[in-house]
From Swiss-Prot:
GO terms for cellular component: cytosolic large ribosomal subunit. The lineage of its organism: Bacteria, Pseudomonadati, Thermodesulfobacteriota, Desulfobacteria, Desulfobacterales. Keywords: Ribonucleoprotein, Ribosomal protein, RNA-binding, rRNA-binding. This is Large ribosomal subunit protein uL6. It comes from the Bacteria. Pfam families: Ribosomal_L6 (PF00347). Part of the 50S ribosomal subunit.
Amino acid sequence: MSRVGKKPIPIPAKTKVTVSNGTVTVQGEKGKLERPLHPDVELKIEGDEITVVPVVERRKITAVQGLVRSLVANMVTGVSTGFKRVLEVNGIGYKAELNGQTLNLTLGFSHPVDFPLPQGITAEVDKKNNITLEGIDNELLGQTAASIRALRPPEPYKGKGIKYAEERIIRKAGKTGA
């Protein structure tokens, strides 16, 4: 049995979990998420806990059990409290503005970059050029944050670019004049 997979997932109050036709549906205060369930595992809902049980005990299914448990736990957390990622825009002349569901970024290119936010993701930009992304789907939120960061990743000499707030950029020394 998987160490992660055998841990039960607590279901918070005001959150409802249902399994039907190989699909897990989690509904809570912030919204509703659906995900297809792997055919080699099944969910057992007992009271206010969910357990992921493998159909057949095999080594590969043990890995899948841990994965499914983490995905369902993220769904439950997402619909009850939500997820949040913060990106920092560093550099002279680099700035971010929010225009509806489009993020307008000036990143030192010859043109401004317009990044349309996917449905289910909300953004906020403060004056210090911090972009705060929020949503209930952890996978979509992480992919959106990574796509925004990929527009101008931080460079190691001056640290200019877009980075995660908790990310530490390892700096390099510049050329030494002879």
